[in-house]
Amino acid sequence: MSDTTDSTAFDSGHFRTIMGHFPTGVTVITAMSPDVDGTGPQPVGFTIGSFTSVSLDPPLVGFLPQLGSSTMDGIKASSSFCVNVLSDQQSDLCWKFAKSGTETTRFDGVEWHAAPSGAPV
């Protein structure tokens, strides 16, 4: 998945500072998948332990989902995604989003709101 960003409005120093506070850890990548089955847009997400900064100019991040992931298909179909960095107090969310299953079961009981992009936070 690759998208270009207008780097004229991007502060690479700020990006470096943000990524410098994330040496390693666990994230939950989320998006709002478009309506593919007539039930409306659906939240999708999975646990990722491989999130990293790839480039400052242009600003790029990378992560490595499981090959054949249906969640990744939903994220690719979305116009944007959100990287939710988990704290050491959020192991329950880590495991919930790491398990295979339907997206609806992953989001069951999870309080979230939509970011300006629409992605679940």
Model-flagged regions — what are they?
Residues 1-121:
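Active-site-proximal mixed secondary-structure blocks
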